[in-house]
Amino acid sequence: GIDLGLKDLATLSTGEKIAHPRHYRRLEDSLGRAQRANKHRLARTIAARIGNSRRDFLHKASARIALAHDTIFVGDVASSSLARTRMAKSVLDAGWSMLRTQLSYKALRHGGMMVEVNERFTTQVCSSCGALPKVRPEGIADLGMREWTCCECGTVHVRDFDRVRSHVARE
């Protein structure tokens, strides 16, 4: 299973985290200067460099994941709705939909399959016992809560890994 995120691009059920290179954020200042100075050719070159590096990174990451796993579970994150929030630049810089597209065709090419899983309550439901405890991370306000303990079974959960385990358990 794979959990797509903003801090790390992806967290795998194996415990591996794929770092988020932040292609746009790295070149954002130089792109802005070129746009303000009306240097259209330079701005176009910088924008192409951002897109090419993001595409290259996602191709390499998706190929590595597709080769290593037969079945891939990915959450159905609605990046278009998150792109209208204050996290828009980070969401669009991550390239989640491009990664999902590449994972789906590369998994098929290598004899596997990719399944999109409903993400609803995956960070809130205990992946061990299935309980929905009263003390749990809820919504955008609790994004800072990275660990929580289930009141029912006492299991300590790290938010990203628990979400991945919930993806696999749902299917």
Region spans (language model):
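Positively charged, helix-rich recognition surfaces that bind polyanionic ligands
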Residues: 1-171
